Amino acid sequence: MEWTETQFDRQRREMVDSLRRNGIQNPWVLEAFQEVRRHLFVPEEGRAHAYDDAAWPIGYGQTISQPFTVAYMTSLLADHVPGGSGRPFGRVLEIGTGSGYQAAILEAIGYSVFSVERLPVLYHQAKAKFHRFGLPITCRLGDGTLGWPEEAPFDGILVSAGAPSEPKALKEQLAENGSMVIPVGNRGMQVMTLVTRKGARFEREQYQNFAFVPLVGREGWDDKNTLLY
């Protein structure tokens, strides 16, 4: 069955309504989810289910996270970076470009987005999508656990994979009062954590439990079976 843009538009509105019913209230986040066409970031075979609240495999052991998870993380970031009631702005680093959907959501909100992906195929696919859709997102291939020191500091960092601990390199790349949203825990379950820089100190708040693919890299999980570059 060939889906039309009208059908996708209706499904996207229903997805946003569902997010709102499930507690996502940030207006800028909801607006971005209405604007960004998620079906363009899902593999062809999954497009009919692009607006279901479910993760979908994108290859190489990676997934595009379910909409609620993306909205939850994005809301945490948007509520704290830069803070206040106006439209969010600032420089945000995303770790784990994956399908490119999370980066597109951040860009739609109003952030200047930098994104690091460790898997070459996913990096090139996402970069091509950003170019095709005219999205001014800067991305690079590399070890996301080390961040992007040449572009630091960042007002916000969003980590789209589960970490065993908070990577020191990422914390050091936060601007003063900047915040990082990162799932921290074991390989099976992580606690969504908000880390905020206050001078030489880092304050933490913990939220709901989630299950992410592992954050692989020098300051993350070791995975010798995965090609990094």
From Swiss-Prot:
It comes from the Bacteria. Coiled coil: none annotated. The keyword Lyase does not apply. One of its GO terms (molecular function) is protein-L-isoaspartate (D-aspartate) O-methyltransferase activity. Keywords: Cytoplasm, Methyltransferase, S-adenosyl-L-methionine, Transferase. One of its GO terms (cellular component) is cytoplasm. NCBIfam families: pimt (TIGR00080), PRK00312.1 (NF001453). The lineage of its organism: Bacteria, Pseudomonadati, Chlorobiota, Chlorobiia, Chlorobiales. Catalyzes the methyl esterification of L-isoaspartyl residues in peptides and proteins that result from spontaneous decomposition of normal L-aspartyl and L-asparaginyl residues. It plays a role in the repair and/or degradation of damaged proteins. Belongs to the methyltransferase superfamily. L-isoaspartyl/D-aspartyl protein methyltransferase family. The active site is at S65. One of its GO terms (biological process) is methylation. It is found in: Cytoplasm. InterPro entries: PCMT (IPR000682), SAM-dependent_MTases_sf (IPR029063). It is an enzyme of class 2 (transferase). Its EC number is 2.1.1.77. The keyword Lipid biosynthesis does not apply. It catalyses: [protein]-L-isoaspartate + S-adenosyl-L-methionine = [protein]-L-isoaspartate alpha-methyl ester + S-adenosyl-L-homocysteine. The gene is pcm. This is Protein-L-isoaspartate O-methyltransferase.
